[in-house]
A protein has these predicted regions:
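Acyl-donor (CoA/ACP) binding surface of acyl/acetyltransferases
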Residues: 2-74, 107, 111-235
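Hydrophobic residues in alpha-helical segments
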Residues: 70, 79, 100-101
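Conserved GNAT-fold acetyl-CoA-binding loop/helix
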Residues: 74-95, 106-108
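A generic secondary-structure signal
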Residues: 95-99, 160
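Short loop/turn motifs at secondary-structure junctions and domain boundaries
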Residues: 98-103, 190
Length: 235
């Protein structure tokens, strides 16, 4: 999701402290057979755990670490410009909680097991009412590239998207020039569907993006044989 749905310049909410959900809520998430979004996740995202990675709700206290991780040139070059201050990330985190409560968006902090520092994010936004179709994206501190953190985190997010949000089609975009991002998407089973010409503006120029998609049926067909790491919801 190189075009992040958050627009800092359009966020006029000033009362960050009252808008933030500062208490982490975990709960049982029930998978439904129809494409109706469970209401549970809107009150607070569950903690998703793997062998090395835990994904949880963003908190105001994550602002400083996200600022350090996501504003470096190598991380930020292929995503919408991230906030440029710690305060800007606090505003972004407050916005993610409002959008989650509205039932249109979910954003997880990426942490390592045994450590609570946020080292990146995974996000999902609906592109069709009720999450029939959605778009997902990610940003991870460069120190954790090539370590398996993305792979495990992506598996957790995809499971959440298809089993909890009941997504039918999950899309992603990556700039053609973003070799690492394209490789990461292919590695988790995303299928390239085309190229969106000059669809993303960055640093004063328009870039072509590759459009990827994962369908629910395809994901269910391959997950049991290709994903070996155990993962679960923490209740």
């Amino acid at each position: 999701m190189e075009k992040m749905p958050y627009r800092q310049e359009l966020d006029t909410n000033q009362d960050l402290r009252t808008q933030m959900v500062t208490t982490q809520i975990t709960q049982t998430v029930t998978t439904q057979t129809s494409h109706v979004v469970s209401s549970d996740w809107r009150t607070g995202l569950p903690v998703l755990t793997g062998k090395r990675v835990a994904l949880r709700e963003l908190r105001a206290s994550d602002a400083a670490s996200l600022f350090a991780m996501l504003t470096t040139q190598e991380v930020a070059r292929f995503i919408s410009p991230p906030p440029t201050t710690v305060d800007g990330f606090e505003r972004f985190i407050a916005w993610t909680n409002r959008q989650r409560a509205a039932g249109t968006y979910a954003c997880f902090a990426v942490t390592l097991q045994g450590f609570d520092t946020a080292i990146g994010i995974f996000q999902i936004r609906e592109t069709e009412p009720g999450f029939g179709s959605a778009e997902w994206g990610f940003a991870l501190g460069s120190a954790f590239w090539g370590t398996g953190v993305f792979q495990e985190g992506a598996e957790l997010v995809l499971e959440f998207a298809f089993d909890t949000l009941n997504v039918h089609r999950l899309e992603a975009r990556a700039a053609v020039l973003n070799g690492r991002g394209n490789g990461a998407l292919l590695k988790v089973g995303a299928v390239q569907e085309g190229v969106l010409r000059k669809s993303f503006q960055r640093d004063g120029r328009y870039l072509d993006q590759v459009l990827y998609a994962i369908l629910e049926d395809d994901w269910r067909a391959v997950r049991d044989i290709s994903w070996k790491a155990p993962h679960a919801l923490v209740h």
